[in-house]
Design a protein with these regions (language model features):
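Domain-edge interaction signal
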Residues: 1-108
Length: 108
């Protein structure tokens, strides 16, 4: 599993609730552009879009995480959202410390 995928799981875990697609996209954008780690060497690229930044790769990988049973599709406040499918396993713990701290700062 890539560090950026682990980071998505970690942010959903930190939220402790279903996270809308828009929220997760904005958190990932902030992580990439406003933190010292910048999300890591191969984090998501973003394009300007209707509601702010958008990443095709982020949505593709989130769909992969749903297919592999890490996330599940749901609704939050009437909007499409992702929620944790099960407890995030130990592989998320292998995420670099700087990235983990930056992700926690963005979600809070």
């Amino acid at each position: 599993m890539l560090n950026r995928q682990k980071c998505l799981l970690y942010m959903v875990e930190l939220a402790g609730r279903p996270v809308t697609h828009l929220e997760l996209t904005k958190w990932a954008f902030l992580l990439a552009h406003e933190t010292p780690s910048h999300g890591g060497a191969s984090f998501y690229d973003f394009l300007p879009y209707k509601y702010g930044p958008f990443s095709f790769a982020l949505f593709h990988e989130a769909d992969d995480l749903v297919r592999n049973g890490y996330l599940r599709d749901t609704k939050a406040d009437g909007r499409e959202a992702w929620a944790r499918a099960a407890e995030v396993d130990a592989r998320v713990g292998n995420m670099p410390g700087g990235l983990r701290a930056d992700a926690a700062r963005v979600v809070e």
